[in-house]
Structure formats: C-alpha cells, structure tokens
C-alpha cells in the first residue's frame, strides 16, 4: 500500500546489490524518508520485458519538488544533505565506484574545448557566432587552464584521500527533482548515481542547479 514508482532502469545491474545495501544502511541509521527498491515475485529487483526494456518498482512519496525560489526550502534541503552525509560514511560489502577526480574533469573539459575550437575553425561558412567564439576563445581557455593550475596547487588531493579513508559517499544527483517536500519532512530520492567522492561535491552540484 502507498505510493510507488515504476521506473525504467538506466543503471548497470552490477550496481544493484550495492544500491540495495546502501538503502538498507540508510534505513537502519534512521533515514526512513528515502525511496527504495521493491523486489518482484522472483525476489529480483529488475523486471525485463520481451523487448529488452528493464524496470524497477520503487517506494515513492506524495509531495512536491523542492521550490528553489524559496530560501527556506533551499536551507532545509541543504540541512537534509548534511544529515545524509553524516551516515553516508560507511564501507559497503559490495564495492562501489569512485568519482572522477575534479582535476581529471577539468582537463577533459579543456581538451573538449580545443576540439570545439578546431571544429569551428573548419566551419564554412562562418556566421556571427563562429567569429565571436573564435575571438573570445583564447581568454576563455586561459581561465580554464588557470582553474586547473589553481586546483593542482590546492590541498584537493589530500582532501580526496581523507574522504576515501573515511569511506565517504555522495548522492551523486542531489538536485531539486530528487528532493520531495512531504508532510512528514523531506524525502530524498534516486540514489542510483551514488559513489565515493568528496561529499561537498553534492552541495556544489545542488547549489549549481539552484543558480541555473
């Protein structure tokens, strides 16, 4: 009985045992306002159709998404995240992936920027946007390279290792879509992208989505 969500599976089946273990751990620590997967008649969490589509059934909550135009709800969501993070420092029996380090992300983005510049240079004919892009690219790229240098000179690597030693985990997709305001308080949904990482990454991602 209650509210449930039938959802198409986009995550790897290999992650399901770790995801189940995470949900169990959170629930045991008193985090009852979370979604979790419901097993089918065969005791499996994923049900496949003849055409190959895969679905899972999840416990859901009646409510609405966090309203990012209301300061009070943003603060409540941030407090909810902090509470989650205190219990999301735990070594799971099933191994989980580590997040891509920020430096690697920055360098990858910079390589992609160069590829975009190369593509725009070869574009024929060029319009107003293409000329403006090429004119401003060098300044933008200098800022991108400066960000990499700043990160390399910071204590990021030490902070990352400390978080790994504490078995820190992040939600991985903590945005207003996954924060449901209910009569009983905030319900946190969709932990499918959880991974090992510096936990403040969740807060950064949440605030970035708020400011967008």
Write out the residue ranges for each language-model feature:
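A generic short alpha-helical patch detector that favors 3-5-residue windows
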Residues: 50, 108, 195-198
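Hydrophobic/aromatic-lined pockets within catalytic cores
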Residues: 85-89, 148, 152, 211
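Gram-positive cell-envelope targeting signals
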Residues: 23, 85, 89, 125, ...
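ATP-dependent phospho-/nucleotidyl transfer catalytic cores
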Residues: 7-13, 94-169
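Active-site activation/catalytic loop segments of kinase-like enzymes and analogous catalytic loops
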Residues: 199-212
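Active-site acidic catalytic loop and adjacent metal/ATP-binding pocket
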Residues: 37, 149-200
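A ubiquitous short alpha-helical element
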Residues: 101-104, 192, 210-211
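ATP-binding pocket architecture of kinase catalytic cores
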Residues: 3-95
């Amino acid at each position: 009985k209650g509210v449930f969500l039938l959802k198409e599976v986009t995550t790897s089946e290999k992650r399901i045992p770790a995801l189940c273990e995470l949900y169990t751990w959170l629930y045991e620590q008193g985090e009852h306002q979370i979604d979790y997967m419901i097993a089918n008649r065969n005791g499996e969490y994923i049900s496949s159709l003849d055409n190959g589509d895969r679905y899972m059934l999840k416990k859901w909550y009646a409510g609405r998404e966090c309203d990012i135009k209301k300061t009070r709800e943003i603060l409540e969501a941030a407090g909810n995240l902090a509470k989650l993070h205190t219990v999301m420092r735990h070594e799971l029996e099933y191994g989980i992936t580590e997040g891509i380090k920020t430096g690697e992300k920055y360098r990858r983005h910079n390589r992609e920027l160069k590829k975009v510049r190369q593509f725009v240079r070869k574009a024929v004919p060029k319009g107003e946007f293409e000329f403006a892009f090429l004119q401003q690219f060098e300044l933008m790229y200098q800022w991108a390279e400066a960000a990499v240098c700043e990160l390399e000179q910071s204590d990021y690597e030490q902070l990352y290792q400390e978080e790994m030693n504490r078995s820190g985990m992040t939600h991985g997709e903590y945005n207003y879509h996954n924060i449901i305001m209910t009569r009983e308080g905030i319900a946190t949904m969709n932990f499918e992208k959880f991974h090992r990482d510096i936990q403040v990454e969740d807060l950064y991602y949440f605030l970035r989505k708020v400011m967008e």
